Each structure stands twice: as C-alpha cells, then as structure tokens.
C-alpha cells in the first residue's frame, strides 16, 4: 500500500474527513516520526510496534557490477519492531 492509497482508504472509511485533511495529517505524522528518529528518539505505538535506530558497524561490501571491495562506513538505520497485537493479527489463521 502506498501513502496515497492509505489516504484514499481513510477518506473512504471516514466520510467527514477531506482528502486534503487526511493527507496533511499523515504527512505531519510521518515528518514528526522522522524528526524524532533523526534526534535518536525511540517511537512506541502501543499495539502496533516501535521504531528505533540500530547501529550498523563498518564493513567491507562489494560493488555488484565490478565485484570490487568497497569500504562501508558505520551508520544508524531505522528499525521497526512489531508489537504483539500486530504480530498476532498478521499471523491469525
């Protein structure tokens, strides 16, 4: 599902909200989440999951075109850990 598909689903389910209002709310929420992660904060949405940063250590990678070894710097990457309710819902038979 893309962001625009999510907006359309919410607009369809919630008849009182305009497409512009839903789009603004989602863009604002995602921007706030990105800013929080950029400053090292952890985001927890109970019942859904948590977002945090994991450190990826420096390593040697390969250029897929040439096969040449390339040194990759260490960096932080966003990580999502699903909550129990989300895991149960996804795995519900």
Curated annotation (Swiss-Prot):
Q: Keyword check for DNA-binding, yes or no.
A: yes
| Basic and acidic residues bias (residue ranges) | 82-93
Q: Which InterPro entries match?
A: Hist_DNA-bd, Histone-like_DNA-bd_CS, IHF-like_DNA-bd_dom_sf, IHF_beta
Pfam families in the record: Bac_DNA_binding
Stretches the record annotates as Disordered: 59-93
Report which superkingdom the organism of origin falls in.
Answer: Bacteria
Q: Write out the GO cellular component annotations.
A: chromosome; cytosol
Protein's GO biological process? DNA recombination; regulation of DNA-templated transcription; regulation of translation
Q: Which GO terms describe its molecular function?
A: DNA binding; structural constituent of chromatin
Q: Which UniProt keywords apply?
A: DNA recombination, DNA-binding, Transcription, Transcription regulation, Translation regulation
User: Partners and quaternary state?
Assistant: Heterodimer of an alpha and a beta chain.
Q: Which family does it belong to?
A: Belongs to the bacterial histone-like protein family.
Q: What does this protein do?
A: This protein is one of the two subunits of integration host factor, a specific DNA-binding protein that functions in genetic recombination as well as in transcriptional and translational control.
What is the protein's name according to its record? Answer: Integration host factor subunit beta
Q: Which organism is it from?
A: Stutzerimonas stutzeri (strain A1501) (Pseudomonas stutzeri)
Q: What is the lineage of its organism?
A: Bacteria, Pseudomonadati, Pseudomonadota, Gammaproteobacteria, Pseudomonadales
């Amino acid at each position: 599902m893309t962001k625009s598909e999510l907006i359309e689903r919410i607009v369809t389910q919630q008849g009182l909200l305009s497409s512009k209002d839903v789009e603004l709310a989602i863009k604002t929420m995602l921007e706030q989440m990105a800013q929080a992660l950029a400053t090292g904060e952890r985001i927890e949405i109970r019942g859904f999951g948590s977002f945090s940063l994991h450190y990826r250590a420096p390593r040697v990678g390969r250029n897929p075109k040439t096969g040449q070894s390339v040194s990759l710097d260490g960096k932080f990457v966003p990580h999502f850990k699903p909550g129990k309710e989300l895991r149960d819902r996804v795995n519900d038979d």
